């Protein structure tokens, strides 16, 4: 009997790992030429970058900056900041826009929270962003591990903590109760794009489920700021973008990031369009008119880029290239 249960469980996990069927790369047209505003060169202190990379390697930690091929890696590492990725480097989903490796993840490293706390202390940073791969293989999607990391960090460091979480497969009541043990300063969950394109770019995810997660967390923990983000250039329409922003605001989200999707490799979804700077500025104005407290919009904006500024600074009419 136990053997049959084990087989069923194994098949269930395998089914989860194989829900992604990339049909999106068929009929790929010629790759779009990058416009000038996408090409950037940032002065880099390579010794500082190696210092941070070595600190991560030393404690077997990961940064989403590296794993997701973030275009801001050099700048952020050069400034001594990093977004930590917990629960390993292998994701149970295979979204065709994402560069993070997918497959069967390793067991949860119970020593990771303390190692993370020690590394943050050694780096001397005062704002921490923690994200994770999706762990559909775990009963709570990794929520308890997030809480353990928050506890360990706060025990040793005087820092603000932002968490960027997956959708936990809709186990909302369970994860809300788990987070009651330790709360972040900012709760971030990316909506990513418009609902019409979800089957194409976020197989395994659900637009309404993501909205409900954000709304439910805000209702239960009203003192915690909620945040979300979109990436553009995958075929969405202006009217759809505006509706998503309205949906997010109605769900209690007050902090917003909007950036340009950049294709990590030829094996990922191609860019349909590069959004001009003027359009990002219009999106920012629209977001503020909807009611968002803070909106960072620009080609290189990512969820955790300049996150510490967004967490406590009022909106200013800064040049969009400096965001």
Swiss-Prot record:
Binds 2 [4Fe-4S] clusters per subunit. One cluster is coordinated with 3 cysteines and an exchangeable S-adenosyl-L-methionine. It is found in: Cytoplasm. Gene3D superfamilies: Aldolase class I. Keywords: 4Fe-4S, Cytoplasm, Iron, Iron-sulfur, Metal-binding, S-adenosyl-L-methionine, Transferase. Pathway: Protein modification; protein lipoylation via endogenous pathway; protein N(6)-(lipoyl)lysine from octanoyl-[acyl-carrier-protein]: step 2/2. GO terms for molecular function: 4 iron, 4 sulfur cluster binding; lipoate synthase activity; metal ion binding. It catalyses: [[Fe-S] cluster scaffold protein carrying a second [4Fe-4S](2+) cluster] + N(6)-octanoyl-L-lysyl-[protein] + 2 oxidized [2Fe-2S]-[ferredoxin] + 2 S-adenosyl-L-methionine + 4 H(+) = [[Fe-S] cluster scaffold protein] + N(6)-[(R)-dihydrolipoyl]-L-lysyl-[protein] + 4 Fe(3+) + 2 hydrogen sulfide + 2 5'-deoxyadenosine + 2 L-methionine + 2 reduced [2Fe-2S]-[ferredoxin]. [4Fe-4S] cluster 1 binds at residues 65, 70, 76, 304. It is an enzyme of class 2 (transferase). SUPFAM superfamilies: Radical SAM enzymes (SSF102114). Its cofactor is [4Fe-4S] cluster. PROSITE patterns: RADICAL_SAM (PS51918). InterPro entries: Aldolase_TIM, Elp3/MiaA/NifB-like_rSAM, LIAS_N, Lipoyl_synth, rSAM. [4Fe-4S] cluster 2 binds at residues 91, 95, 98. Its EC number is 2.8.1.8. It comes from the Bacteria. One of its GO terms (cellular component) is cytoplasm. Residues 77-293 form the Radical SAM core domain. Belongs to the radical SAM superfamily. Lipoyl synthase family. PANTHER family: LIPOYL SYNTHASE, LIPOYL SYNTHASE, MITOCHONDRIAL. This is Lipoyl synthase. The lineage of its organism: Bacteria, Pseudomonadati, Pseudomonadota, Gammaproteobacteria, Enterobacterales.
